[in-house]
């Protein structure tokens, strides 16, 4: 197991990190309430660093994101701009996209506790997360066309897959502000809760259930299977079969069966880091996607 890292002792830019606690739950708080938790480039960079560290830390079982105060995140801080633009179109990389990919590539389950308004990258950064729980009072907007730009943070990939092309096009085309309970957002949130103050406690309940009762490897590979988007049931069947063959031989599979028969909670130990180290079903190769991934 990797040495436990003290996340809270580091001077992150406008981020507060709580945990991981005894169950392995870490909370990343966007702590810039005086600016509606608008993101700066140092905040984006720090979140990517945090995700990398937590992904490699065996003591972290689940990561929860939330916002300080009444907002979840009002998007990029426009007073600071969008960061350095690449020298050419081919070399420029969207900062929000870098964060989205860091979340996507993190093996640990991620949960967004959307306690208030989420706009622009404030909502698109949550799309790669495993679960989104929002306050019914939260307002949501994808305002890119109102700023003469296009969707960011790989949201043109995620949003249609989460809510369908029709709803995604409506949200992107209008750029308007909608209630979290709007029918246009149907399917985006796993749950909506009555108040902003209930959002984080509910997210922590879900996180604790995941941390205590599920296999890290099984959860990560299942998510990868879903996003791989097999083109036919036959393709899905072949890939699932290959992964199942490997998992049937794992200690966690044996523990899962044994704990069920003994009517107790499982004590899973396998990690994705260990699986990759053994050369079994590498992510980005035979698990998720093509033999060679696009060069970024």
Swiss-Prot record:
Its EC number is 4.2.1.17. Its main location: other. Keywords: Lyase, Peroxisome, Virulence. InterPro entries: ClpP/crotonase-like_dom_sf, ECH/Chromodomain_protein, Enoyl-CoA_hydra/iso. Gene3D superfamilies: 2-enoyl-CoA Hydratase, Chain A, domain 1. A motif (Peroxisomal targeting signal type 1) lies at residues 294-296. GO terms for cellular component: peroxisome. CDD domains: crotonase-like. Pathway: Mycotoxin biosynthesis. It is found in: Peroxisome. Pfam families: ECH_1. It catalyses: a (3S)-3-hydroxyacyl-CoA = a (2E)-enoyl-CoA + H2O; a 4-saturated-(3S)-3-hydroxyacyl-CoA = a (3E)-enoyl-CoA + H2O. The keyword Cytoplasm does not apply. Enoyl-CoA hydratase; part of the gene clusters that mediate the biosynthesis of the host-selective toxins (HSTs) AK-toxins responsible for Japanese pear black spot disease by the Japanese pear pathotype. AK-toxins are esters of 9,10-epoxy 8-hydroxy 9-methyldecatrienoic acid (EDA). On cellular level, AK-toxins affect plasma membrane of susceptible cells and cause a sudden increase in loss of K(+) after a few minutes of toxin treatment. Belongs to the enoyl-CoA hydratase/isomerase family. Gene clusters encoding host-selective toxins (HSTs) are localized on conditionally dispensable chromosomes (CDCs), also called supernumerary chromosomes, where they are present in multiple copies. The CDCs are not essential for saprophytic growth but controls host-selective pathogenicity. This is Enoyl-CoA hydratase AKT3-2. It comes from Alternaria alternata. The gene is AKT3-2.
């Amino acid at each position: 197991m990797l040495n436990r890292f003290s996340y809270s002792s580091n001077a992150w830019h406008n981020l507060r990190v709580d945990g991981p606690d005894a169950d392995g739950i870490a909370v990343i708080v966007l702590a810039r309430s005086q600016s509606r938790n608008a993101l700066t480039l140092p905040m984006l960079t720090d979140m990517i660093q945090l995700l990398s560290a937590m992904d490699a830390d065996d003591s972290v079982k689940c990561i929860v994101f939330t916002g300080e105060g009444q907002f979840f995140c009002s998007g990029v801080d426009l007073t600071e701009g969008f960061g350095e633009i690449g020298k050419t179109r081919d070399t420029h990389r969207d900062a929000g996209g870098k964060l989205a990919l860091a979340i996507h590539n993190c093996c640990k389950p991620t949960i967004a506790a959307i306690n208030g308004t989420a706009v622009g990258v404030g909502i698109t950064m949550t799309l790669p997360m495993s679960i989104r729980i929002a306050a019914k009072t939260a307002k949501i907007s994808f305002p890119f066309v109102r700023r003469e730009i296009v969707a960011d943070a790989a949201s043109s990939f995620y949003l249609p897959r989460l809510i369908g092309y029709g709803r995604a096009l409506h949200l992107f085309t209008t750029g308007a502000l909608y209630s979290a309970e709007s029918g246009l957002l149907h399917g985006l949130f796993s749950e909506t809760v009555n108040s902003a103050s209930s959002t984080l406690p509910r997210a922590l309940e879900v996180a604790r259930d995941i941390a205590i009762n599920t296999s890290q490897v099984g959860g990560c590979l299942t998510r990868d299977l879903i996003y791989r988007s097999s083109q036919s049931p036959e393709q899905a069947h072949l890939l699932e079969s290959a992964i199942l063959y490997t998992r049937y031989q794992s200690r966690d599979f044996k523990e899962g069966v044994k704990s069920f028969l003994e009517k107790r909670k499982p004590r899973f130990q396998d990690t994705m880091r260990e699986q990759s180290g053994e050369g079994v079903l590498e992510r980005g190769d035979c698990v998720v996607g093509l033999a060679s991934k696009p060069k970024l």
